[in-house]
């Protein structure tokens, strides 16, 4: 889980108290880890979306026709997408999964090597 954006002041249409540092939840260690700061505040009316390649797109904020408007976006690339030398890491691929799932049922998904516990 990635938490991105927000502020501490609750003041609408303002970048006062902006939280620039995203955090990632590690379910194994049950701890949050801070990652690299955002370059632009993401406050009121902002959005973050998980992209199909594992990166996170975040954009917007403001909508007040003032300095707190941020009609732009940025893309966060989680560290696990890369090897230590900066090259792209091999990503697991879903090899088999059901076409339909039912609420309350267990879903089994087969993936190529490298998939961790989900």
Where are these regions (language model features)?
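Kelch-like beta-propeller repeat domains
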Residues: 1-118
